[in-house]
Design a protein with these regions (language model features):
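Aromatic-rich carbohydrate-recognition surfaces in CAZymes
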Residues: 286-419, 458, 628-654, 689-704
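Extended glycan-interaction surfaces of carbohydrate-active proteins
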Residues: 246-285, 325-350, 414-451, 498-629, ...
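Short, surface-exposed loop/turn motifs at beta-strand boundaries within globular domains
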Residues: 289-291, 454, 562
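Extended, well-ordered alpha-helical segments in internal regulatory regions
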Residues: 376-379, 460-476, 566-580, 636-645
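Long, acidic, intrinsically disordered low-complexity segments
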Residues: 214-253, 312, 390-416, 572-588
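Terminal accessory carbohydrate-recognition/targeting modules of carbohydrate-active enzymes
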Residues: 2-10, 14-265, 275-294, 298-310, ...
Length: 706
């Protein structure tokens, strides 16, 4: 341990990393391609993640508190403006403390040679995220600061008091003994502040600042330590611990298993959990996401305490829109300021200036509207939850819950009255007329340009209607008023049971051969050769292939992209054995015929049966493409299989995923090197992700139902 690391411990409570990525005992470090991260608890128990992107030299600190804050900078070596630096985490713990309304955390980095540090961004993690999406990390190290265009336009319109808050203040203090770079920035409304300090020993390093860029020259051939201190005066969340989150049965199971994998996932769940919300993921999505919470609630039922659904439902119900729809995502702190400023610029409404940090909600997604009744239905049907708790929940949230149930019934009514494809629940339209992908495949091409999603219309709407009927029954049984117009809901639920017929795609052997060969012919030589060899080894001769399309186009015609979405259908609804076999079959057929990729996992989609225009869509945006495996989809399928006698399918999927070395990631991809397929970490993947951590329930189910 270095002298600097010892000093860090003396200046605050020693805080060892709560999680480290990659962990050589659990991960394949090569698959992380120079990426590393450490996660801590601050003095209030809030999560702090620090990561180093070795490809770009970007170092980001996420503060997962009530403002979703971040502090980031880029480190480059002397090899040129675009050369990432040799920088790494120093050994030893961090230090955490609170003082004068600030929470602080300090740790150490090691640097070699001569490095330049710039591109400082202090503010919302959403702004850091946009900095990355815009590719600005590849700008010269002394490029003008990244400022959201909304802020620039706002400053041009308002007086000068805001201008000085647009960019961070940078000041170097240097003596022969040591040096300290101090960087600070207030929020645009000056209500909150973030601070960053970099400190070095003058005997081992020399520091200068030019045009907002810090240059550190290491004296000698050995690496030198630089301490990094971050601080915030933002509000903290109230964290939950494992005893509050998990059931006693699961905790006993985890304690007896003594599994490093389970312990890491339990810690991950703690890092995401607070009384206010379950955050979607660290580092990029450290805030409320309705879909992520609600889907997690369904998957985690087997392992968490029966109070957790109350936290989840309460968080969603507190944010309902006026019509009863569920908020997909909240905008906090700096991002709330950004969105309120944008609305002010658009409308001129000066009342927005009274509270620029007023939380804003995003209601564009539609799947979460139907997921809330499903979670509520499971909660009220749970006989282990005492009636007095249910009454107490209804006393606080009953009016909001009924508003959501009524909204769902209204959305489902058109199809119940006229069950044709174009009466299904459609995505909302963007300004350009494009059907906004309003479910979990929320990249622009996630649903291949479709308007009616399989998962919304075959899984969530029917499940929501059935849940409303179940909720009505429980409410009446415990002496509460039932759901209004329940007879109409019952009739709608019956009609919606037939919605799957609109999505089914059936292909004969000749069509399968023609389309798969056409897809392979469009690929680069190396990639095509690999998949040709897969098909040759498999030696499959399929008479027919049936699968549900990812979506329907605007005219109600299926877009024949095979996906993992039927896994949720299997999990939530019992099928007869023949239907179950048909649903499961594509998961186990080798890609590019099905979804199974040996040594990687389950491709989240297979576009081989679609048109070249769809292939091009996915080639341009890989997030929900055949090049990606999503941990949530693996968990959904395994959870479904755990309740059925399918040991062969379970073993095949688990083995493929384990061989990737990335089975703990939110999502992962693969690339070709020397003709071989190699799994790799997906660039924007979360290190700790709510959906991925549902593996806890999968492991419990698989190991307790043997």
């Amino acid at each position: 341990m270095t002298v600097l690391a010892v000093l860090l411990m003396l200046q605050g409570a020693a805080v060892p990393p709560y999680l480290v990525f990659p962990d050589s005992t659990l991960d394949d470090p090569a698959a992380y391609e120079g990426y590393s991260a450490r996660l801590y608890h601050d003095s209030r128990g809030n999560s702090v993640e620090t990561y180093i992107d070795g490809k770009t030299g970007r170092i980001v600190h996420l503060w997962a508190d009530a403002l979703n804050e971040s502090i980031g900078f880029t480190v480059r070596n002397s090899g040129g403006q675009k050369a990432a630096a040799a920088v790494a985490f120093d050994r030893g713990p961090a230090a955490a403390w609170s003082s004068g309304g600030r929470r602080s955390l300090r740790y150490a980095l090691t640097v070699r040679g001569t490095v330049q540090i710039g591109q400082f961004i202090l503010g919302s993690m959403r702004i850091e995220r946009d900095f990355g999406y815009a590719g600005r990390v590849h700008d010269p190290i002394d490029a003008p600061p990244f400022v959201p265009q909304e802020f620039t336009a706002f400053v041009q319109r308002m007086d000068g008091v805001y201008r000085q808050r647009l960019t961070p203040s940078i000041r170097l203090e240097s003596t022969a003994r040591d040096w300290t770079l101090r960087v600070s920035q207030p929020s645009l409304d000056a209500r909150n502040h973030l601070w960053l300090s970099l400190h070095g020993d003058g005997r081992t390093t020399r520091a200068t600042v030019t045009n907002g860029v810090l240059t550190i020259q290491v004296r000698g051939a050995q690496p030198a330590s630089v301490s990094v201190e971050i601080a915030t005066d933002g509000a903290a969340l109230a964290p939950l611990n494992r005893r509050q989150i998990f059931s006693a049965d699961f905790r006993r199971f985890a304690d007896s298993a003594k599994s490093p994998r389970l312990e890491r996932e339990i810690r991950g769940f703690e890092l995401l959990s607070s009384k206010q919300k379950l955050m979607a993921g660290l580092p990029t999505y450290a805030t409320y996401f309705g879909r992520d919470m609600l889907m997690t609630a369904l998957l985690m039922e087997a392992v968490w305490s029966d109070t957790m659904p109350e936290f989840v439902m309460g968080a969603a119900l507190a944010k309902l829109g006026p019509d009863g729809d569920v908020s997909h995502e909240e905008a906090l702190g700096g991002q709330a300021i950004r969105e309120n400023v944008a609305e002010f610029l658009r409308t001129g409404d000066t009342t927005l200036l009274r509270n620029l940090q007023r939380t804003r909600e995003n209601y564009w997604m539609i799947d979460d509207d139907f997921q809330l009744p499903v979670v509520a239905g499971h909660y009220f049907a749970n006989a282990s939850v005492p009636e007095d708790r249910k009454h107490a929940f209804l006393q606080r949230w009953g009016a909001a819950l009924r508003k959501n149930l009524a909204y769902v019934a209204r959305q489902a009514a058109p199809y119940a009255q006229n069950p044709v494809a174009t009466s299904l629940v459609s995505f909302k339209r963007d300004a350009d007329g494009y059907c906004h992908p309003g479910s979990w495949r929320d990249s622009r091409v996630g649903y291949a340009g479709g308007c009616y999603a399989f998962d919304v219309n075959v899984v969530w709407v029917p499940q929501a209607l059935a849940a409303i009927v179940a909720i009505d029954s429980v409410l009446r049984d415990i002496g509460e008023p039932g759901v209004e117009q329940i007879a109409d809901v019952r009739r709608a639920a019956q009609v919606w049971q037939g919605s799957a017929r609109h999505f089914m795609v059936g292909l004969d052997s000749a069509t399968i051969e023609t389309r798969v060969r056409a897809k392979l012919a469009s690929l680069p030589t190396e990639e095509r050769a690999h998949w040709d060899s897969v098909l040759e080894r498999a030696a499959l001769h399929l008479d027919t292939l049936r699968f549900p399309a990812v979506s329907l186009d605007s005219t109600g015609q299926p877009i024949p992209v095979m996906t993992t979405d039927p896994g949720m259908w299997l999990l939530l609804e019992r099928q007869d054995s023949s239907v179950e076999r048909e649903i499961l079959r594509p998961f186990l057929l080798p890609y590019p015929i099905g979804l199974f990729i040996d040594g990687v996992g389950l491709a989240v989609a297979n576009d081989a049966y679609a048109t070249p225009a769809v292939w091009d869509m996915y080639a341009r945006d890989l997030y929900h493409s055949p090049r990606v495996v999503w941990g949530r989809e693996v968990n959904v399928l395994l959870a479904a299989l755990a309740t059925r006698h399918r040991p062969g399918a379970i073993d095949s999927v688990r083995t493929a995923v384990a061989r990737s070395g990335l089975q703990y990631a939110e999502l992962w991809s693969y690339k070709f090197e020397g003709g071989a397929l190699r799994p790799v970490r997906y660039g924007s993947a979360s290190d700790v992700q709510l959906w991925t951590l549902t593996d806890l329930a999968v492991q419990y189910l698989l190991n307790t139902r043997k």
